[in-house]
Amino acid sequence: MLVTIQNARSVGGTITAPPSKSMAHRAVLCAALAEGRSHITNLEFSKDISATLGAAAQLCARVRTGADDAVVEGLGHFVPLAAPVDCCESGSTLRFLIPIASLTGQAVSFTGRGRLMERPQSVYDALYREQGLRFEQSAAGLTVEGALTPGEYRLAGNVSSQFISGLLFALPLLSGSSTLHLIPPVESRSYIDMTRAVQAAFGVQSHWLDENTLAIPGGQAYHPCDYTVEGDYSQAAFPAVLGAVCGDVTITGLAPETLQGDAAILDILRRCGAVFTRTAEGISFEKAPLHGVDIDLADCPDLGPVLMVLGLLCEGTTVIRNAERLRLKESDRIAAMEAELRAVGGLVESEGGTITVHGCANRLHAPAGALHGHNDHRVVMSLSVLALSTGIPLTVDDAEAITKSWPNFFEAIKPLGAEVEYA
């Protein structure tokens, strides 16, 4: 799908952050593993969350959805699988479920779409083979079989935290206790602690023995509860960058105290010179001169694409470090954003996991044709921010990719002054 984004008027208005996708994944799985009825409120049924709800229904729960909520009734046991578990394009769904699948006592196969089955699973592959379990991955799907055992687990701390969270979901349900030793540096620690916090709401505990070691008591059980998902800082980053550049944007629905690592967007914008205030009504941005800064993306990789847009619109140079994982997402986000930003005159270069963006707002121009969304929701939304921030109408293909995380994105930005045309 092609979409053209341009300014219908000057930028300004109020937008509500959508529910946190990261927290919703975790709440749905904890509810599914709990015997009994849980009610999860403030949900957005993106493709990723729908994939996790569908997987829960296949494995161990009854699921009933409303307009923005879901009742998840955990069965207290796993059911025989008649078909592979479809994870769609959701890396979180797949990586969270692989260890859970090892609790079922059966072979479990997973399928996916897009680049999902190309994304690396070497952490689990090595772990399963070490325990003598079956782990088979191909372009068509992935199959695991065999039961994990309680004990000592060693994982690199600089891999995706999704692997660590996946083990955190499953290990408390084993008969004995386990210890997770994370080889430093530990990146995305906030996502690990988010998993632990959501688990705690459902009655499951773990604790840090030191900054690199997690103790996970065995013999635990998840308990049903009512859970409200807070607003999503990773999605709020898009209107936040727009507000920092143009001013007069207010974002509502974000918790002041949060474990979301992507809340770092506010500190990054502040260091760039952004002016904003936080009140009971939300976070309100004023227009201010912005300058480039040095950004460490290790704990907030999802912010990468929109921060590359921000860098173009700042004075001076922005350097984004520890961004290697961007190359392994729905697209190679570094290469994708480099190509599209250069198409509008942007000055961007990268080497490995380091991205250098030169502020060049005054030399940006309309591209020769449509920009490419690379079937990546964050690329499409970042290019939309670029269009509104610069006043340059941009046509972007693969615009339907937004349904992966924020299906209502284009409608949500209209009150900020956006005009969106579909083709």
Predicted region positions:
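Short, structured segments at the rim of ligand-binding sites
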Residues: M1-A423
